[in-house]
From Swiss-Prot:
Flavonoid 3-O-methyltransferase involved in the biosynthesis of polymethoxylated flavonoids natural products such as myricetin derivatives, aroma compounds possessing antioxidant properties and exhibiting pharmacological activities such as anti-carcinogen, anti-viral, anti-thrombotic, anti-diabetic, anti-atherosclerotic, and anti-inflammatory effects. Catalyzes S-adenosylmethionine-dependent regioselective 3-O-methylation of flavonoids; active on various hydroxylated flavonoid substrates. It catalyses: 3',4',5'-O-trimethylmyricetin + S-adenosyl-L-methionine = 3,3',4',5'-O-tetramethylmyricetin + S-adenosyl-L-homocysteine; kaempferol + S-adenosyl-L-methionine = 3-O-methylkaempferol + S-adenosyl-L-homocysteine + H(+); quercetin + S-adenosyl-L-methionine = 3',4',5,7-tetrahydroxy-3-methoxyflavone + S-adenosyl-L-homocysteine + H(+); myricetin + S-adenosyl-L-methionine = 3-O-methylmyricetin + S-adenosyl-L-homocysteine + H(+). It comes from the Eukaryota. Homodimer. Keywords: Methyltransferase, S-adenosyl-L-methionine, Transferase. It comes from Solanum lycopersicum. This is Myricetin 3-O-methyltransferase 3. The gene is MOMT3.
Length: 361
């Protein structure tokens, strides 16, 4: 009779917490196995199969390995691990001849790691998070306390934004991750927020390669968009219909438009810099215009739900990468807006982990 763990009941609370504690180090293993699975195209191979249900040997035969037979044995262990983490389902059947056949197919969780109909997925963000350049920063995390150092700067000798200009490979990894996450976020924003309706012109401040604007204009093609960022950033931006890329510095001035978008900008900077950015937006805004801020938001109390856990996790990332960058509470965002001169602060929607905030004069 096969051994199953599903019917084991652990009622001793001390034992439960000890077992949870013993499992904590395994979090690293999951991320690194997922990285390997993405690099090997495991999830895409399963998704593209006609049955979407493959054995380890069938998957190994589609990987450029020197020995599919031996590789399938190693792969079987990886697939079983991923199934135990809810990234795959494991199907065990017996053939007429009595032989056991094991196959695997995707789950909703692993579906997020394959390309969707828009050509985006979470996979590039996982590759960024587990990239050696990013991981090396965490070895200096304690220095943020001991020495007041920014871990990324300590690990690489330069500010994170400067490093991108020195390492084209990592810059490509970063840009691809941001492109995918932005597309996923904005698709959801456009499903739950209608504040772009009737708008004629939008400027995306710190818009990078123009992904957010492109998403908005794909739904509202009559909008004219200005993608505003540093000249060396927009020089690599692709051409989009309805979007003009304009070089400039948001700390000096912002071009005038009826709607100003700030997506994932404020969490990169300290309070003083944020107020400076928001004041420039206030000056550029007509009386009936609005600033749309899209950011994660922390609860006042560190709750243990998904939204709270993610915002506090990203806050640790900001601490690792940037000087002064951080996630903020509703009150902290509202205080920044008031200091910049805005009189109306509205939270109008939530898209996954992001909140949509409207600011008015």
């Amino acid at each position: 009779m096969a051994l199953s763990m599903d019917n084991i009941v652990i009622s001793n609370e001390e034992e439960i917490y000890m077992m949870k504690a013993m499992h904590i180090p395994c979090g690293l293993y999951l991320n690194m196995v997922l990285r390997a699975a993405i690099e090997l195209d495991l999830f895409e191979i399963i998704a593209k199969s006609t049955t979407q249900k493959l054995s380890s040997y069938e998957i190994a035969s589609q990987i450029p390995t020197k020995n599919p037979n031996a590789s399938s044995l190693v792969l079987e262990r990886i697939l079983r691990f991923l199934a135990s983490q809810s990234f795959l389902t494991c199907n065990i059947t017996k053939n007429d001849d009595g032989n056991v056949h094991t196959s695997y197919n995707l789950t909703p969780l692993s579906q997020s790691l394959i390309l969707d109909k828009d050509g985006t997925s979470i996979a590039p963000f996982l590759l960024l998070a587990t990239d050696p350049v990013a991981v090396n920063s965490w070895f200096h995390f304690k220095d943020a306390i001991l020495e007041g150092e920014i871990p990324f700067n300590k690990a690489h000798g330069v500010h994170a934004f400067e490093y991108h200009g020195k390492d084209s490979r990592f810059n490509g990894v970063f840009n691809k991750a941001m492109q995918n996450v932005t597309c996923i976020d904005m698709k959801r924003v456009l499903e739950c927020y209608n504040g772009f309706e009737g708008v004629k012109e939008i400027i995306d401040v710190g818009g990078g390669l123009g992904i957010s604007l492109a998403s908005i204009i794909s739904k509202y093609p009559n909008i004219k968009g200005i993608n505003f960022d540093l000249p060396h950033v927009i020089k690599d931006a692709p051409t989009y219909e309805g979007i003009e890329h304009v070089g400039g510095d948001m700390f000096k001035s912002v071009p005038q438009r009826e709607l100003i978008l700030l997506k994932a900008i404020l969490h990169d900077w300290d309070d003083e810099c944020c107020v400076k950015i928001l004041k420039n937006c206030w000056r550029a805004l007509p009386k009936d215009g609005k600033v749309v801020v899209i950011e994660q938001m922390q609860p006042e109390y560190p709750e243990i739900n998904l939204i709270s856990k993610n915002s506090f996790s990203v806050d640790m990332l900001m601490m690792t990468m940037l000087d002064g960058g951080k996630e903020r509470t509703k009150q902290q965002f509202e205080d920044l807006a008031k200091q910049a001169g805005f009189t109306v602060f509205k939270i109008v929607a939530r898209a996954y982990y992001c909140w949509v905030i409207e600011l008015y004069k």
